Design a protein with these regions (language model features):
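Mobile, glycine- and charge-enriched loop segments
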Residues: 1-6, 12-13, 71, 83-86
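Short, flexible loop/turn elements at secondary-structure junctions
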Residues: 5-10, 34, 93-95, 120-122, ...
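Short, well-formed alpha-helical segments that are part of the catalytic scaffolds
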Residues: 10-24
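Hydrophobic targeting segments
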Residues: 1-5, 20-21, 27-32
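Residue-level recognition of beta-strand->loop/alpha-helix junctions
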Residues: 32, 60, 117-119
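Catalytic-site signature of metal-activated, phosphate-bearing donor transferases
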Residues: 67-73, 97-279
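Active-site-proximal specificity loops/subdomain of glycosyltransferases
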Residues: 36-89, 96-97
């Protein structure tokens, strides 16, 4: 099993992301996505990769906040090993599975499934704050509140394709599989999809640290993707209304305090699964 990630804009979570996955991978492919040749993401990324005895698969200089381009890199890298299994994860996404991934892969091989899906669990700090994360942080404890606030606040798609064969193509944002006939894997069932009642991957999203507010402002001004710009502006506006905190008391956010990475502790996951696959 291989891992591919694209790291751009900042490296806040890259160390924690690699630390989460590296012991379980045969090979790790990191694409450093810089916005210019002097972008600090290059030097910072190289420094973090050294801690895992890794070299970047590629260093790319390209337009900032172009998620279609990012998805192209994911699909291209996976195609290097089309028959292998791959975890695809952004650098702020820590995936949790209902059982060891090798068991899921064995079942996929036996029954002909080619991809596994899941959805976002939004992580935030104590009292709904956006904490400062460093390499020394324990991110599960620094961001102990697990909920579902991004979609209610901005209508951002919460679906993710998390584990797949290398020849499986994903669409922008890695939200769904893109099939050759033009259709996607939207919905709760597909003959090539591992049954979601057996596993619906929790994608714990550690995007919401202290640096995200400035990033929301920057993306809202980008011309690379108007729909993403509008979504990020809406998210920023909603956060501003609540005094730059996330309201932990709102029932629709379904918050639960979980200071570790245990799939089976998230009490609302079945309820969330049904909601996410309907979006």
């Amino acid at each position: 099993m291989n891992l591919v990630t694209v790291c751009g804009h900042n490296t806040t979570m890259l160390y924690h992301m690699l630390n989460h996955y590296h012991l379980h991978m045969d090979e790790i492919f990191v694409v450093l996505y810089a916005h210019h040749s002097k972008d600090p993401v290059i030097e910072e990324g190289l420094h973090i990769l050294e801690k895992f005895n890794l070299q970047p698969h590629e260093i790319i200089v390209d337009e900032p906040f172009n998620w279609e381009r990012v998805t192209e890199h994911y699909n291209r890298v996976k195609s290097l090993k089309p028959d292998d299994w791959w975890i695809v994860a952004d650098d702020d996404e820590l995936q949790l599975y209902s059982k060891p991934t090798w068991e899921i892969i064995d079942e996929c091989e036996e029954f002909g499934y080619e991809f596994v899906t899941g959805g976002f669990v939004d992580r935030i700090g104590d009292n709904g704050d956006f904490p400062k994360i460093t390499m020394e942080s324990n991110v599960w404890k620094e961001m102990p509140e697990a909920g579902f606030f991004r979609y209610p606040m901005s209508k951002a798609c919460p679906n993710k394709v998390t584990l797949m064969k290398g020849n499986v193509q994903v669409c922008s944002g890695q939200h769904y599989v893109q099939f050759e006939d033009g259709f996607t894997s939207w919905g709760s069932e597909h003959p090539k999809r591992y049954p979601i009642k057996k596993n619906f991957t929790q994608v714990h999203h550690f995007k919401w640290d202290y640096s995200v507010l400035e990033r929301l402002r920057q993306v809202s001004k980008t011309k690379a993707n108007v729909s993403f710009a509008q979504e990020y502006q809406l998210m920023y506006d909603e956060i501003e209304k609540s005094d730059f905190k996330i309201d932990l008391t709102k029932p629709e956010f379904m918050f639960q305090r979980i200071g570790n990475g245990n799939y089976h502790q998230l009490e609302n996951w079945e309820k969330l699964r049904k909601k996410i696959v309907s979006i």
